[in-house]
């Protein structure tokens, strides 16, 4: 995949954003997070979706932890082969797990590290994680592993727990892969539960804690693409997976990993390509050997090339409707001719298949040439992490990876191609027409490469100030004028933003309608703030405050998922010396005002590039970017503004540096228990007004706490208008808190407000010392809620854009349609959009909020370094401050679900973005009110299904890039589905539906022929996943909170699921699947159909893409069924009419 990043959280700015700030940003259109599984995540222009991933890191200066040793460089230890290897192990003697003292690590990090360099030049970092093994070292026997499992079982990990989602459980679901414009992530309970589920499922599927993991970074990326084969580096990243000389099966590595509870991924950046995987420890050595063949002797057979080109092309098609990717490609096009920043990194069928064929280029031969030239051992850095001794890991790595060839050629170097954007076209105003409804201004500077200044991190210092949201900040000033909603600035350190040729500094501001009309004034405000910083010069007080905050975070650093960790470390090995491998991208080491000042002084109007993104630009843009079809225009800066900015303009007295931060923790004492220790949360308060669950942490032993409350009200779901008013309320409350709570955020105290389906969710976490101050601030603002007419108008106008932007995405519309059919009394996004368009008043909002606060049931969970007495104070503060009455009767926090009739029902609707060829096809089978045992059996079924589903529908049939089966719990009602993201330019959605049915038929035969050994292996794999220990406290809290927020309270769910798994037989699996696929099966297909030649309009004519065009009227357009499925399906052409005739299933919780 091409690597994507999000801006924010600043990963881009590298300052940590508050949770609420991220939510506002998400709502208003600044991209703040992303996943990178061949996905496009997002960041503010210009680095919106380039290869790169979210590398949000805390930073810290910790001079007392610096090593006395020097960078070992070429003099570092070289692992020797054969007899030398034994000699090396013998030399260490009793220090069999001794790490390298040169490598600086956090005092909280229990792992051991060793650096080696193989004779072929490959550099490797070995990570031995023997924590929680009670002194065990070396290889354990299978019996010892079983003991280890039993010991760890009490931890009751969340990884594969049945996270029952009130909306629907998206287990094994990748449908957010391209959800890179997070402006549409509204704070709703389904998203709260989805977020919990995504975390658990991501760990189960991709980053399961305490799995063994490895990552390898090749120091070459898309910059090395030949001019006549754009996208070749990205294509090669795909092709090496397609079998090797030693293991020729095309899908063999994925199949091996799935069989043993693992996963893999890869990504291509400008100057790096990264591969990573995780797997159960028992199979780690074999997995390493299989994986290493990618780099030793991949087959890359001709037959696979044409099919995998389609996968790359589908990835590109999925990326095309993303404003992030469109802006990135436009920005790259501004580079000097011949500079690699201007290349088309994605690749597609045109560049990798059709054009080469036309020009007699042998793609297969060129692919192999590229591999031979650039996949050389001396360009590679490898990281492996496992519960093995360092000597064992060294032996394995030496034995396996020494086989990777070294061609002896110098690594490609692009450092001489500096100043890529030193062109007349850069310092202009670019108006761009977006896909989404949004107004945004991005100001960008191209600076000399900053990597060499990593010990000072000047751009981090600057971004910390530019992105500040407290008094005196840019955003505070613009918010008071109702011109802006969110601002992010900085450099995300992705390959697109920071490479050997330049570094970017960008400031992206989400504008209101009024702010769009005053965008020049907005830019002027930014320039005034920067001028103020330049006149004052770097401030040591500010630098040391950042150091203090980040020092706290580093010292009490929590562990991360192994696969994420090794991925990050293998990249860190490329630019950083040995002692800084773990810290180079996190810590601030030295205060050098001259370095900061040099970067700061370049941020002047005369060197800035301005991009104005707005639908209002439509009709004014006569240019079109080649690859993504982005409409844009180029203008000189208006004379009056250009003259002002070139003059010695005045400073703005409302802009100033932030005051000293009162939220920085200074007390890190671990508190004593004031009640008996418990394995799971216990209810310590239970009144008619609310209840509180509590668990004191005694496992991770860090001075942090998590506070979560759910304020439940029946008022919200009474009408679509009420749901919208609740969204407005939550977002105005977040807006009101942004400035006063920002200091807490930068002090590593985070909060998030979620407008749930049935109540307001408050989440607060961080160092426990000052956490009560933040919690009380939130509750105070909630109790005294108010809004001005200007803020109300600003938020409601933006909410219209947000709803619109959700609806134009095929994957989110498909989900909305599916849940509208299944969940009774659910208000769809279209209902909400219409209610908002019909008009709501500030008076109606204030009346709604008053009624909401008057009668509630409050449920909370407090975990961490907090006593039970302190925990009860949190609930008491909410009750006393809001002074509400209890609910008259108990209220369910889930919807009722309709019972689908037997048969195959199809709801086929037109996508709402006419410029989008992407279609989404989901085939869903409803099971019903089932037990926990049956849920676990369904999990096992989907785990069996995952790899053959990918192999059949993507690899062999090439139907689309995103292909996945899913376990679903829709308000407690079980089901499973298969989803394919395809394109109307390639396939009719009903062809895809039939192929899904074809796959399920073949899968039935596959599991019938499954051997007992293969069945037991998969059962063991799922058990192992569920037995994995939590990496940090937040994971345990997520799992427990999921039980509380869904009112199921089965805190030992994993133990029950493991017990169920041990009782299953192959016949249980086969019979369950057949029962749901038989004549009485309840099947629902949802098709959201894109625009392209294989799909028809309502009048029967072929549809076509209309770039940059969306339907202004947000309503479902039902499409007729084609003859392909007409004989076997029951069409749904009116959802309300269909569902009103159906029976309702009872409320159901999966607790037995």
Swiss-Prot record:
It comes from the Eukaryota. PROSITE patterns: INSULINASE. One of its GO terms (cellular component) is dendrite. Binds 1 zinc ion per subunit. It catalyses: Hydrolysis of polypeptides, preferably at -Xaa-|-Arg-Lys-, and less commonly at -Arg-|-Arg-Xaa-, in which Xaa is not Arg or Lys. It is found in: Mitochondrion; Cell projection, Dendrite. The keyword Transmembrane does not apply. Residues 141-198 have a biased composition (Acidic residues). One of its GO terms (molecular function) is metal ion binding. The modification Phosphoserine is found at residues 86, 94, 96. InterPro entries: Metalloenz_LuxS/M16, Pept_M16_N, Pept_M16_Zn_BS, Peptidase_M16, Peptidase_M16_C, Peptidase_M16_M. The active site is at residue 237. Residues 1-20 form the signal peptide. Zn(2+) binds at residues 234, 238, 315. Its EC number is 3.4.24.61. Residues 81-108, 133-208 are annotated as: Disordered. Keywords: Cell projection, Hydrolase, Metal-binding, Metalloprotease, Mitochondrion, Phosphoprotein, Protease, Signal, Zinc. GO terms for biological process: positive regulation of axonogenesis; positive regulation of membrane protein ectodomain proteolysis; positive regulation of myelination; proteolysis. Interacts with BACE1 and NRG1. Cleaves peptide substrates on the N-terminus of arginine residues in dibasic pairs. Is a critical activator of BACE1- and ADAM17-mediated pro-neuregulin ectodomain shedding, involved in the positive regulation of axonal maturation and myelination. Required for proper functioning of 2-oxoglutarate dehydrogenase (OGDH). Belongs to the peptidase M16 family. This is Nardilysin. It comes from Pongo abelii (Sumatran orangutan).
């Amino acid at each position: 995949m091409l690597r994507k990043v999000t801006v924010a959280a600043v990963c881009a700015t590298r300052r940590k954003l508050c949770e609420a700030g991220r939510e506002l940003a998400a709502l208003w259109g600044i991209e703040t997070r992303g996943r990178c599984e061949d996905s496009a995540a997002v960041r503010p222009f210009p680095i919106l979706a380039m290869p790169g991933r979210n590398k949000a890191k805390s930073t810290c200066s910790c001079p007392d932890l610096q090593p006395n040793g020097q960078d070992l460089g070429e003099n570092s230890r070289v692992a020797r082969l054969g007899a030398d290897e034994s000699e090396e192990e013998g030399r260490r003697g009793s220090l069999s797990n001794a790490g390298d003292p040169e490598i600086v690590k956090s005092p909280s990090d229990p792992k051991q590290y060793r650096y080696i360099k193989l004779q072929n030049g490959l550099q490797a970092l070995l990570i031995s994680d023997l924590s929680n093994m009670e002194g065990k070292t070396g290889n354990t026997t299978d019996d010892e592993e079983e003991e280890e499992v039993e010991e760890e079982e009490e931890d009751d990990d969340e990884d594969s727990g049945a996270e029952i989602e009130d909306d629907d459980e998206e287990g094994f679901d990748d449908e957010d892969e391209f959800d890179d414009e997070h402006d549409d992530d509204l704070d709703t309970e389904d998203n709260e539960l989805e977020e919990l589920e995504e975390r658990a499922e991501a760990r189960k599927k991709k980053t399961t804690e305490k799995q063994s993991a490895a990552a390898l970074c090749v120091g070459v990326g898309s910059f090395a693409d030949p001019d006549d084969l754009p996208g070749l580096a990205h294509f090669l990243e795909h092709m090496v997976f397609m079998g090797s000389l030693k293991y020729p099966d095309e899908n063999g590595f994925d199949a091996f990993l799935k069989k043993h509870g693992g996963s893999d991924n890869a990504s291509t950046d400008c100057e790096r390509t990264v591969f990573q995987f995780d797997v159960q420890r028992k199979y780690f050595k074999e997995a390493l050997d299989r994986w290493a063949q990618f780099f030793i002797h991949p087959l890359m057979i001709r037959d696979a090339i044409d099919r995998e080109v389609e996968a790359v092309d589908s990835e590109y098609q999925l990326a095309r409707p993303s404003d992030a990717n469109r802006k990135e490609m436009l920005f790259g096009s501004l580079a000097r001719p011949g500079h690699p920043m201007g290349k088309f990194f994605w690749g597609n069928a045109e560049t990798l298949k059709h054009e080469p064929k036309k020009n007699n280029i042998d793609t297969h031969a060129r692919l192999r040439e590229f591999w031979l030239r650039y996949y050389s051992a001396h360009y590679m850095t490898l990281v492996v992490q496992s519960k093995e001794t360092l000597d064992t890991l060294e032996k394995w790595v030496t034995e396996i990876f020494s086989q990777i060839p070294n061609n002896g050629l110098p690594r490609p170097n692009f450092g001489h191609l500096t100043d890529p954007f030193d062109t007349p076209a850069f310092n202009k105003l670019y108006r761009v027409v977006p896909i989404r409804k949004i107004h945004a201004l991005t100001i960008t500077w191209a600076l000399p490469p900053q990597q060499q200044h990593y010990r000072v991190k000047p751009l981090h210092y600057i971004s910390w100030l530019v992105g500040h949201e407290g008094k005196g900040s840019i955003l505070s000033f613009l918010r008071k004028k109702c011109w802006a909603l969110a601002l992010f600035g900085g450099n995300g350190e992705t390959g697109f933003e920071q490479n050997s040729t330049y570094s970017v500094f960008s400031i992206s501001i989400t504008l209101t309608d009024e702010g769009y009309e005053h965008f020049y004034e907005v830019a002027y405000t930014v320039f005034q703030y920067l001028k103020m910083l330049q006149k004052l010069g770097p401030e040591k007080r500010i630098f040391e405050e950042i150091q203090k905050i980040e020092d706290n975070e580093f010292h009490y650093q929590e562990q991360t998922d192994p696969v994420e960790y090794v991925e990050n470390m293998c990249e860190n090995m490329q630019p950083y010396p040995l002692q800084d491998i773990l810290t180079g991208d996190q810590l601030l080491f030295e205060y050098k005002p001259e370095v900061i000042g040099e970067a700061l002084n370049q941020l002047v109007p005369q060197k800035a590039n301005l991009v104005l993104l707005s639908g209002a630009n439509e009709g004014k843009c006569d240019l079109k970017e080649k690859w993504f079809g982005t409409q844009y225009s180029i203008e000189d800066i208006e004379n009056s503004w250009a003259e002002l900015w070139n003059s010695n303009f005045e400073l703005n007295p409302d802009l100033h540096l932030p005051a000293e931060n009162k939220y920085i923790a200074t007390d890190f004492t671990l508190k004593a228990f004031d009640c008996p220790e418990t394995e799971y949360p216990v209810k310590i308060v239970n009144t008619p007004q609310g209840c509180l669950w509590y668990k004191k942490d005694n496992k991770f032993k860090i001075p942090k706490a998590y506070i979560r409350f759910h304020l439940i009200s029946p008022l919200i779901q009474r009408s679509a208008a009420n749901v919208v008013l609740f969204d407005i309320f939550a977002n105005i409350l977040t807006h009101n808190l942004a400035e006063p709570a920002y200091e807490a955020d930068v002090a590593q105290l985070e909060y998030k407000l979620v407008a749930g389906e049935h109540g307001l969710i408050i989440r607060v976490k961080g160092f426990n010392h000052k956490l009560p101050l933040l919690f009380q601030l939130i509750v105070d603002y909630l109790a005294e809620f108010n809004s001005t007419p200007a803020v109300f108008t600003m938020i409601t106008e933006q909410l219209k854009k947000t709803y619109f932007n959700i609806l134009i995405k095929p994957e989110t519309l498909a989900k909305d349609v599916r849940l509208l059919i299944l969940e009774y009394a659910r208000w769809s996004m279209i209902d909400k959009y219409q209610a908002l368009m019909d008009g709501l008043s500030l008076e109606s909002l204030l009346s709604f909020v008053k009624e909401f606060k008057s009668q509630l049931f409050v449920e909370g969970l407090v975990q961490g370094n907090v006593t039970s007495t302190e925990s009860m104070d949190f609930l008491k503060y909410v009750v006393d401050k809001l002074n509400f009455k209890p609910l008259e009767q108990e209220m369910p926090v889930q919807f009722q679900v309709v019972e689908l009739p037997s048969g195959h029902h199809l709801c086929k609707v037109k996508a709402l973005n006419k410029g989008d060829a992407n279609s989404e096809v989901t085939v869903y089978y409803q099971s019903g009110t089932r037990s926990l045992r049956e849920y676990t059996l369904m999990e096992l079924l989907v785990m069996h299904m995952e790899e053959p589903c990918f192999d059949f529908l993507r690899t062999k049939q090439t139907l689309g890039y995103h292909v996945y089966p899913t376990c679903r719990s829709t308000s407690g009602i079980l089901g499973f589905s298969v989803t394919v993201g395809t394109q109307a330019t390639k396939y009719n959605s009903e062809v895809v539906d039939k192929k899904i049915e074809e796959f399920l038929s073949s899968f039935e035969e596959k599991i019938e022929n499954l051997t007992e050994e293969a069945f037991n292996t998969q059962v063991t794999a799922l058990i192992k996943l569920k037995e994995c220990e939590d990496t940090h406290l937040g994971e345990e809290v997520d799992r427990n909170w999921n039980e509380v927020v869904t009112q199921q309270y089965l805190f030992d769910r994993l133990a029950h699921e493991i017990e169920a798994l041990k009782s299953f037989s192959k016949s249980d699996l086969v019979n369950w699947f057949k029962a749901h696929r038989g004549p009485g099966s309840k099947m629902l297909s949802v098709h959201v159909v894109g625009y392209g030649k294989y799909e028809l309009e309502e009048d029967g004519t072929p549809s076509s893409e209309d770039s940059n065009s969306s339907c202004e009227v947000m309503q479902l357009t039902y499409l007729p069924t084609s003859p392909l499925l007409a004989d076997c399906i029951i069409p749904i052409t009116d959802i309300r009419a269909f569902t009103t005739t159906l029976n309702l299933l009872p409320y159901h919780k999966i607790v037995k």
